[in-house]
């Protein structure tokens, strides 16, 4: 899938899809967070994997 803007519930749904039962986390506000990365800009499914719990 191409990179796309993911905001709000669309972003959460994409994280559940990519991360599955591992779950996911948000980075601290002083770093570039997932909203800045995926909503204000675009991100790919590969980018989303970086926010999954290990």
From Swiss-Prot:
It is found in: Secreted. GO terms for biological process: glucose metabolic process. Keywords: Carbohydrate metabolism, Disulfide bond, Glucose metabolism, Hormone, Secreted. SMART domains: IlGF. Disulfide bonds join 7-39, 19-52, 38-43. InterPro entries: Insulin, Insulin-like, Insulin-like_sf, Insulin_CS, Insulin_family. It comes from the Eukaryota. One of its GO terms (cellular component) is extracellular space. GO terms for molecular function: hormone activity. Insulin decreases blood glucose concentration. It increases cell permeability to monosaccharides, amino acids and fatty acids. It accelerates glycolysis, the pentose phosphate cycle, and glycogen synthesis in liver. PANTHER family: INSULIN, INSULIN/INSULIN GROWTH FACTOR. Heterodimer of a B chain and an A chain linked by two disulfide bonds. Belongs to the insulin family. This is Insulin. It comes from Squalus acanthias. The gene is ins.
């Amino acid at each position: 899938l191409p990179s796309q803007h993911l905001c709000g519930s669309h972003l959460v749904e994409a994280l559940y899809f990519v991360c599955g039962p591992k779950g996911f986390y948000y980075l601290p506000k002083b770093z570039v967070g997932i909203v800045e990365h995926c909503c204000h800009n675009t991100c790919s499914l590969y980018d989303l994997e970086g926010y999954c719990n290990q």
